[in-house]
């Protein structure tokens, strides 16, 4: 769980920030590639201004060159997190790419249930790039509903949910969602796993994940581009969906290798449905961009 919250509100009266030049954009494009592995084409120059100009206002910097120089100072390294928050994509949702959750129920969970019963095996899942938490909570609800309380209690199931963006992690930890956001959740699961949020200023439109589901998940902040991950365990199931699409080929291959290395034998890796065409050593491709470790 992130210990520090980041406020994007400018502390001074806003002033006009000059649009980035091509040279300035190239500086940030290289920085974003280095730090996050993201590819930003020249068409994203408008996006740099739209997402980052408030940070320049906050520090009373007028040009993107000024802000780039500011970021290069060792004493300002913490400012990089604000940049990460501004430039990362945070789209998420319950039952996004529903085929994956159908596959969990039909193919993966039955095998896991047998292992948990016969071998007393504990299950560890990872939502890599969890954004606002819907994916991780989705995994937890589906697992709880299929496997039952008895099997997942006492450490039978734990889920790691990670993201580089601290702003969305703060939101995920709260576990609060509007009725519109949870509309894809089947009614039977909505009634079972959501409750009215008592801290939402009597806003009946906000519901919270129940505590029995929340306690299954640990939210952690770290960068998937790090050379090593602060993870000691092996996972039986990893979701890393719609992340690879944004990465340059070299970083994409590195990330895939790390994910495979963190999979337990016979574990499953789930990628985004459009993230096809990757050849993973030691992995068998099943369907819907789902792989199993040999």
Write out the residue ranges for each language-model feature:
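Conserved beta-strand signature within the Rossmann-like core of class I S-adenosyl-L-methionine
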Residues: 266-273
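Conserved AdoMet
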Residues: 2-126, 272
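Conserved class I S-adenosyl-L-methionine
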Residues: 120-133, 137, 158-160
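Extended basic-aromatic, gly/pro-enriched interface segments that bind polyanionic ligands
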Residues: 128, 152-235, 239, 243-247, ...
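A structural alpha-helix within SAM-dependent methyltransferase catalytic domains
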Residues: 105, 140-144, 260
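A short glycine-rich, Lys/Arg-flanked "PGG" loop and its adjoining helix->strand segment in the class I
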Residues: 253-265
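Conserved SAM-binding loop of SAM-dependent methyltransferases across substrates and taxa
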Residues: 132-151
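Class I S-adenosyl-L-methionine
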Residues: 275-294
């Amino acid at each position: 769980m992130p210990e520090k919250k980041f406020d994007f509100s400018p502390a001074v009266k806003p002033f006009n920030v000059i649009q980035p030049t091509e040279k300035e954009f190239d500086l940030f494009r290289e920085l974003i590639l280095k730090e996050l592995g993201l590819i930003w084409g020249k068409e994203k120059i408008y996006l740099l201004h739209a997402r980052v100009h408030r940070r320049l206002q906050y520090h009373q910097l007028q040009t993107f060159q000024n802000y780039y120089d500011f970021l290069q100072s060792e004493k300002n390294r913490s400012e990089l997190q604000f940049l990460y928050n501004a430039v990362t994509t945070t789209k998420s949702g319950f039952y996004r790419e529903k085929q994956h959750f159908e596959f969990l129920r039909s193919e993966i969970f039955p095998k896991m249930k047998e292992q948990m019963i016969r071998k007393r095996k504990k299950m560890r899942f990872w939502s890599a790039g969890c954004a606002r938490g819907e994916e991780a909570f989705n995994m937890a609800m589906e697992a709880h509903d299929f496997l039952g309380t008895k099997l997942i209690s006492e450490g039978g199931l734990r889920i790691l949910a990670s993201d580089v963006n601290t702003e969305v992690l703060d939101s995920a930890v709260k576990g609060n969602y509007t009725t519109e956001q949870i509309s894809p959740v089947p009614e039977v699961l909505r009634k079972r796993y959501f409750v009215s949020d008592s801290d939402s200023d009597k806003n009946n439109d906000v519901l919270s994940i129940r505590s029995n589901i929340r306690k299954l998940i640990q939210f952690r902040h770290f960068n998937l581009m790090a050379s090593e991950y602060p993870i000691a365990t092996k996972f039986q199931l990893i979701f890393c969906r719609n992340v690879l699409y944004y990465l340059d080929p070299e970083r994409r291959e590195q990330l895939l290798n790390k994910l495979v290395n963190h999979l337990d034998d016979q574990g499953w890796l789930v990628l985004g449905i459009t993230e096809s065409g990757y050849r993973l050593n030691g992995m068998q491709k099943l369907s819907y961009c789902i792989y199993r470790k040999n």
